[in-house]
Regions:
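Glycan-recognition and catalytic cores of secretory/periplasmic carbohydrate-active enzymes
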Residues: 1-120
């Protein structure tokens, strides 16, 4: 069973851009579980690769989800911090979930389908 989990998690790392040159695909909740899985794999196998993947995933989540989306007119860290300070404190302004659609702007009306469409 452990080998199956290892294979799945290494595939996840590759397909989401964690261990490959693919564009990173980050989604907060899935990535949180992935960090737990990598840490447990490291604990079970003593293979430092899994610890490194967990740390790299945390860093990538902070960098991608702590910043505004690429299609947003705003740039940089959600917190508004400079790049240097944002790297030091990546979660100070919170993290995006990483859903495929942009966040609803404050002036946009509530859409009942928002929850179903984005799995929130």
């Amino acid at each position: 069973m452990l080998e199956v989990v290892e294979k799945l998690m290494l595939q996840y790392a590759y397909e989401t851009g964690l261990s490959s040159n693919l564009k990173p695909k980050r989604y907060l909740w899935t990535d949180a579980f992935a960090v737990c899985n990598f840490l447990e794999l490291w604990r079970k196998t003593s293979n430092a690769t899994y610890l490194e993947l967990a740390i790299k995933l945390i860093d990538q989540v902070h960098y991608v989800l702590g910043r505004h989306r690429e299609d947003d007119v705003r740039r940089g860290w959600i917190s508004g911090l400079s790049d240097e300070d944002g790297f030091k404190h990546p979660t100070i302004g919170g993290l995006r979930i990483g859903k495929s659609l942009p966040e609803r702007r404050p002036d946009e009306p509530y859409d009942e389908l928002e929850w179903e469409r984005d799995g929130q």
